[in-house]
C-alpha cells in the first residue's frame, strides 16, 4: 500500500528513569486543583492546538478527522482511493468499533493527540515572560505534562457537579502568555471549525449547520445545552459505578471485557464491556450533539478526556489480568485497510498509526503497555512495588476506593445520589429524625419531588429496623416520577450512623441480606442490531413507574441505567458501518440492578435479594423504553433484534470486602416473557 507521509507516532518523548517511572496522566479535577500551572498550560496549549490550520497533518481538525468524518485518508494511508465517492469502494474509515481492536486501536490514536498537544504546550510555556521567573515556572511544569482524563464513574468531590464546570463553562480564566489573568473562550467546552467544511462535502448537511461542536443542542436554535449533562450523570451514577466495578473485578477474558459485539455463544455474564460503558458516556454527554455520533465525536474536546479514561480503565484491567489478551478473530467488516473476514489479532497493524521507526504500523501487542508511549496513571505506577502481587493488591484497593468494594458498600455511598441531582435529601448525623438540607430541599421543590424526599427519609429509617426483623411485604409505592432542576451532588451532609460504612466488608444494617457473605447479584442484559434504526438510540431501564414523556426519562427517579447503541444510517460514508448494517451486526450491554433492588429493600418494597422475592418484584416493576438520537420515543417492537433479559449470579464477599463472582449465571425468562422484546423461554440469550 502506498503512502504519502510516514508520520511516526511516538507519544511524548520520555527519558528513561532508573526505576522505570514515567509521568502520569491525571484526572481533570486533580490537575486543576493540585497542578494549576499544568492545567493553565493545558488550556492555552489546547487553544493553540485547536487554532492550527486545518490543512496541517497534525492539526486538531486532521487528528479528530481520523475517527470519522470527513472520511479521508490520513497521512496518505491509503493515498490512491477517492473517498469523496462513497460508492467508489467497499471501505471507509479507520476506527474499529465493535471489533477486537477497539481499545488497542485507540491507544496510538490518543498518543498522536497527546504528542501534538504536548508540542503545543511546550511552545506556550516558552512564550511566558522571563521576568519574575514566570517562564521558568511554566517550562518546568510543561516538562511532565500529559493529557488528562475525566473519570465519569467516580464520586465527584463534595459540593461539585457530576459534570465539571471546567467542561461546561463557555469561558474560563487563565494566566495568558503575557502574564495577565484573563477570560478566554473555553477550549474544553467546544471546538470551533475554521471553516466547518475546509473541503466541500467534508461534513454532511446535518453537521455542517454547526460552526462549533455542541452538546444536547436545542432543536430550534442549535444552541448547546451543557446544563443537561450534570443531572443525567448524577442520576445514573450508581449504575455506572457498579458497571465499572463489575468490569474491573469480575471480567477475566480480554475479548469479553473489551468490545460489545454479540454472538449466539455470548455468556449471560459477558453482555457488558468497556465499549458498552464507553458508549453510555458518549450518549449521556452528547445527547443529540457531536459526542453521540461516532462520525463527528472526536471534534468535541470532551472526546479526548473520555477516551483517555477508557484507556486508563483498560490499563487497570490489563495489569490485573496480565495473561489475558485478544483471541484472533475474523474482521467483521471492511475498512480502509482491512478486508472483511481477514483475521484480526494482536499482530494486526493498527493503521494509520506508524510506529516510532516510521517503518511499520503499531500492533496491539506493541501497545499493550502504556509506558511504551511514556505515561502511566495514578493507579498503574508499577515501579513503586516490589512484586506483581503487591502491585495488584494496590490496584484493587484503588478500584474499591473509587468505585466501591461491593454492592452493599456501594449502596451506602450511592443511596443518596442515585436520584436526579440530589433530589434525595440526605439525613444528618446523630439526630433521631432526618432533616433536609436547604440545597436539597430547594432541589426537591424545584423538581416537584416531595414524595421522593419522603421515600429517602424512609430509606434511612427502615435500615436498622430491617436488620432486626423480617420485612412485611407492602404494596408497591414507587416514588412518583419527576425531573431534575438542581444538579449539585455529593453535598457535605452526614448520613445517619446506621447507614455509614462499617469497618467490616458489609455495613451492619445490611448483613442479613448476605448470610455468610454470599448474595445474589442481578443484571439486565440488552442486545439489538447496532445500525437497525439508522441512528444512535438508547434502551433505558426503569424499576417502577415513570413519566411517559421521554423528555423526562434521563432524570427519572426510577431510571436504573441504559444501554446506548451508537448506530449510523445506511447512507453513511463509513464503509465498515455499511457492512455492519448489511450483516445485521448485533451489540450488547448490561445494566446492573442490585443497587436499585437494595433501595427497594430498605424502602420496604422488597424482602431480599433471593430469587423467590426478586422474580415477582421485577415481573411487576421492571420496564424499559427506547429513545432515539433526538430524544423521541420509538416503538420497542420495531427495533431489530432487540431482546431484554434478566440474569443473576452468586457473589461471595471476602474479608476485605472484595466481591468474587461465581460467573455461573441463571437467566429468568419468567420475568421478561410477554413484555415487549422481553426474553422468553424459547428465545436464544
From Swiss-Prot:
Q: Which UniProt keywords apply?
A: Acetylation, Copper, Melanin biosynthesis, Metal-binding, Monooxygenase, Oxidoreductase, Thioether bond
Coiled-coil positions are none
Pfam annotation, one family: Tyrosinase
Q: Give the N-acetylserine positions (modified residues).
A: 2
GO molecular function list: metal ion binding; tyrosinase activity
Broad EC category = oxidoreductase
The note describing how and how many cofactors are bound reads: Binds 2 copper ions per subunit.
Q: Which residues form the propeptide?
A: 409-685
What's its EC?
1.14.18.1
The residues the record assigns to binding Cu cation A are 67, 97, 106
Cofactor names: Cu(2+)
Q: Where is this cross-link: 2'-(S-cysteinyl)-histidine (Cys-His)?
A: 95-97
Q: Which reaction does it catalyse?
A: 2 L-dopa + O2 = 2 L-dopaquinone + 2 H2O; L-tyrosine + O2 = L-dopaquinone + H2O
Q: Where does Cu cation B bind?
A: 278, 282, 307
Relate the protein's function as given in its record: This is a copper-containing oxidase that functions in the formation of pigments such as melanins and other polyphenolic compounds.
**Which protein family is named in the record?**
Belongs to the tyrosinase family.
What's the protein called, per UniProt? Tyrosinase
Q: What is the lineage of its organism?
A: Eukaryota, Fungi, Dikarya, Ascomycota, Pezizomycotina
Q: Which gene encodes it?
A: T
Amino acid at each position: 500500500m502506498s503512502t504519502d507521509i510516514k508520520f511516526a507516532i511516538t507519544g511524548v518523548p520520555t527519558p528513561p528513569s532508573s526505576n522505570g517511572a514515567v509521568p502520569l496522566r491525571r484526572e481533570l479535577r486533580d490537575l486543576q486543583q493540585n497542578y494549576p500551572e499544568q492545567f493553565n498550560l493545558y488550556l492555552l496549549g489546547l487553544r493553540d492546538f485547536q487554532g492550527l490550520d486545518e490543512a496541517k497533518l497534525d492539526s486538531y481538525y486532521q487528528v479528530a478527522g481520523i475517527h470519522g468524518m470527513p472520511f479521508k485518508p490520513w497521512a496518505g494511508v491509503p493515498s490512491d482511493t477517492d473517498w469523496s465517492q462513497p460508492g467508489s469502494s467497499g471501505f471507509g474509515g479507520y476506527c474499529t468499533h465493535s471489533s477486537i481492536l477497539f481499545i488497542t486501536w485507540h491507544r496510538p490514536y490518543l498518543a498522536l493527540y497527546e504528542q501534538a498537544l504536548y508540542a503545543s504546550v511546550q511552545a506556550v510555556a516558552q512564550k511566558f515572560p522571563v521576568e519574575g521567573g514566570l517562564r521558568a515556572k511554566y517550562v518546568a511544569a510543561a516538562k511532565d505534562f500529559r493529557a488528562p482524563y475525566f473519570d465519569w464513574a467516580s464520586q465527584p468531590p463534595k459540593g461539585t457537579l457530576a459534570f465539571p464546570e471546567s467542561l461546561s463553562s463557555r469561558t474560563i480564566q487563565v494566566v495568558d502568555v503575557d502574564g495577565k489573568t484573563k477570560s478566554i473562550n473555553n477550549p474544553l467546552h467546544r471546538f470551533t471549525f475554521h471553516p466547518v467544511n475546509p473541503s466541500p462535502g467534508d461534513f454532511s448537511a446535518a453537521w455542517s449547520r454547526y460552526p462549533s461542536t455542541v452538546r444536547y443542542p436545542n432543536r430550534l436554535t442549535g444552541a448547546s445545552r451543557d446544563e443537561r449533562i450534570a443531572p443525567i450523570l448524577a442520576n445514573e451514577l450508581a449504575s455506572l459505578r457498579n458497571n465499572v466495578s463489575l468490569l474491573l473485578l469480575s471480567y477475566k477474558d480480554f475479548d469479553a471485557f473489551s468490545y460489545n459485539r454479540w454472538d449466539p455463544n455470548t455468556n449471560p455474564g459477558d453482555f457488558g464491556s468497556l465499549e458498552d460503558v464507553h458508549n453510555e458516556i458518549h450518549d449521556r454527554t452528547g445527547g443529540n450533539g457531536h459526542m453521540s455520533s461516532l462520525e463527528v465525536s472526536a471534534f468535541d474536546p470532551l472526546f479526548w478526556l473520555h477516551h483517555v479514561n477508557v484507556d486508563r480503565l483498560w490499563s487497570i484491567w490489563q495489569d490485573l489480568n496480565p495473561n489475558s489478551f485478544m483471541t484472533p478473530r475474523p474482521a467483521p467488516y471492511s475498512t480502509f485497510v482491512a478486508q472483511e473476514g481477514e483475521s484480526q489479532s494482536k499482530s494486526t497493524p493498527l493503521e494509520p498509526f506508524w510506529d516510532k521507526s516510521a517503518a511499520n504500523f503499531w500492533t496491539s501487542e506493541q501497545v499493550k503497555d502504556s509506558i511504551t508511549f511514556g505515561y502511566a496513571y495514578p493507579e498503574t505506577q508499577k515501579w513503586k512495588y516490589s512484586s506483581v502481587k503487591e502491585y495488584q493488591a494496590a490496584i484493587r484497593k484503588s478500584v474499591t476506593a473509587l468505585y466501591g468494594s461491593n454492592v452493599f458498600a456501594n449502596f451506602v455511598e450511592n443511596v443518596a445520589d442515585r436520584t436526579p441531582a440530589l433530589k434525595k435529601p440526605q439525613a444528618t448525623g446523630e439526630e433521631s429524625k432526618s432533616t433536609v438540607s436547604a440545597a436539597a430541599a430547594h432541589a426537591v421543590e424545584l423538581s416537584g419531588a416531595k414524595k421522593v424526599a419522603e421515600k429517602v427519609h424512609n430509606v434511612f429509617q427502615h435500615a436498622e429496623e430491617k436488620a432486626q426483623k423480617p420485612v412485611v411485604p407492602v404494596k408497591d409505592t414507587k416514588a412518583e416520577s419527576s425531573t431534575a432542576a438542581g444538579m449539585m451532588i455529593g453535598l457535605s451532609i452526614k448520613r445517619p450512623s446506621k447507614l455509614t460504612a462499617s469497618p467490616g466488608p458489609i455495613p451492619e444494617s445490611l448483613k442479613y441480606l448476605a448470610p455468610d457473605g454470599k448474595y445474589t447479584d442481578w443484571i439486565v442484559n440488552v442486545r439489538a442490531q447496532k445500525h437497525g434504526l439508522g441512528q444512535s438510540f438508547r434502551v433505558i431501564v426503569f424499576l417502577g413507574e415513570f413519566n411517559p414523556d421521554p423528555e423526562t426519562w434521563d432524570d427519572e427517579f426510577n431510571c436504573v441505567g441504559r444501554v446506548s447503541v451508537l448506530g449510523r444510517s445506511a447512507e453513511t460514508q463509513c464503509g465498515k458501518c455499511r457492512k455492519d448494517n448489511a450483516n445485521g451486526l448485533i451489540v450488547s450491554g448490561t445494566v446492573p440492578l442490585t443497587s436499585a433492588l437494595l433501595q427497594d429493600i430498605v424502602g420496604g418494597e422488597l424482602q431480599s435479594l433471593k430469587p423467590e422475592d426478586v422474580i415477582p418484584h421485577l415481573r411487576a416493576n421492571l420496564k424499559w423504553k427506547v429513545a432515539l438520537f433526538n430524544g423521541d420515543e420509538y416503538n420497542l417492537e420495531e427495533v431489530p433484534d432487540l431482546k431484554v433479559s434478566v440474569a443473576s449470579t452468586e457473589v461471595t464477599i471476602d474479608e476485605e470486602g472484595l466481591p468474587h463472582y461465581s460467573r455461573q449465571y441463571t437467566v429468568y425468562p419468567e420475568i421478561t416473557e410477554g413484555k415487549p422484546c422481553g426474553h422468553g423461554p424459547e428465545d436464544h440469550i
